[in-house]
Amino acid sequence: MSAAARVLPKAVTFVTGNAKKLEEVRAILGSSVPFQSLKLDLPELQGEPEYISKEKARIAASQVNGPVLVEDTCLCFNALKGLPGPYIKWFLEKIGHEGLNNLLKAYEDKSAFAMCIFSLALGPGEEPITFVGKTAGKIVPARGPNYFGWDPVFQPDGFEQTYAEMPKSVKNNISHRGKALALVKEHFASASYTVQSNDST
């Protein structure tokens, strides 16, 4: 529990250029976290997912000179010891849904987990706080509308539908992103951040 509410100089900037991701984040967070979105060209880093996310948050906080929220998503195949992991975006661009299935062709184990890491840096020089959400499932031949990344090939455990086949409200409830954002909401509720209003809207 925080002793006193921290005053943020401005609303949190959620760094993304992905319209579908922004739509999901808005739907899940609602008005619980005041944020604006901005596309920034952040360097593509290599390393463990949490390290990548924190580094991006540090860089973004310096660029916007204020609080930022960045997100990194991984799709980890257990048979491949966690790959493609944080590099899923490039794998998908290069080999598509069928290629992702082909990666597991030689393996009986089609299990995978989706992981989402949000990092919140309250300003330049501040140590980012991370929030991690995971959903276990398996990789299947693509089913459902091809609107959003690898949604058509990921079927969460306990469901007969892929992410792509689910109603958005169901997906947002059980997804890796939904779970991570639930922790973000919890953090904002307990930290009682307030945004400085020189110019209130």
From Swiss-Prot:
GO cellular component: cytoplasm
PANTHER family noted in UniProt: INOSINE TRIPHOSPHATE PYROPHOSPHATASE, INOSINE TRIPHOSPHATE PYROPHOSPHATASE/HAM1 PROTEIN
Sites where the protein binds Mg(2+): E44
Gene3D superfamilies: 3.90.950.10
Listed cofactors: Mg(2+); Mn(2+)
Gene Ontology annotations of biological process type: deoxyribonucleoside triphosphate catabolic process; nucleoside triphosphate catabolic process; nucleotide metabolic process
Cited InterPro entries: ITPase (IPR027502), ITPase-like_fam (IPR029001), RdgB/HAM1 (IPR002637)
Enzyme category, top tier: hydrolase
Cofactor binding annotation: Binds 1 divalent metal cation per subunit; can use either Mg(2+) or Mn(2+).
Location relative to the cell: Cytoplasm
Highest taxon of the lineage: Eukaryota
HAMAP family reported for this sequence: HAM1_NTPase
Residues annotated as binding ITP: 16-21, 56, 72-73, 89, 148-151, 171, 176-177
Primary residence: cytoplasm
Function: Pyrophosphatase that hydrolyzes non-canonical purine nucleotides such as inosine triphosphate (ITP), deoxyinosine triphosphate (dITP) or xanthosine 5'-triphosphate (XTP) to their respective monophosphate derivatives. The enzyme does not distinguish between the deoxy- and ribose forms. Probably excludes non-canonical purines from RNA and DNA precursor pools, thus preventing their incorporation into RNA and DNA and avoiding chromosomal lesions.
Family statement: Belongs to the HAM1 NTPase family.
EC nos: 3.6.1.66
Subunit structure of this chain's protein: Homodimer.
Pfam family, one: Ham1p_like
Entry annotated with the keyword Metal-binding: yes
Disulfide bonding pattern of the chain: none
UniProt keyword list: Cytoplasm, Hydrolase, Magnesium, Manganese, Metal-binding, Nucleotide metabolism, Nucleotide-binding
Catalytic reactions on record: ITP + H2O = IMP + diphosphate + H(+); dITP + H2O = dIMP + diphosphate + H(+); XTP + H2O = XMP + diphosphate + H(+)
Record protein name field: Inosine triphosphate pyrophosphatase
GO MF annotation terms: dITP diphosphatase activity; ITP diphosphatase activity; metal ion binding; nucleoside triphosphate diphosphatase activity; nucleotide binding; XTP diphosphatase activity
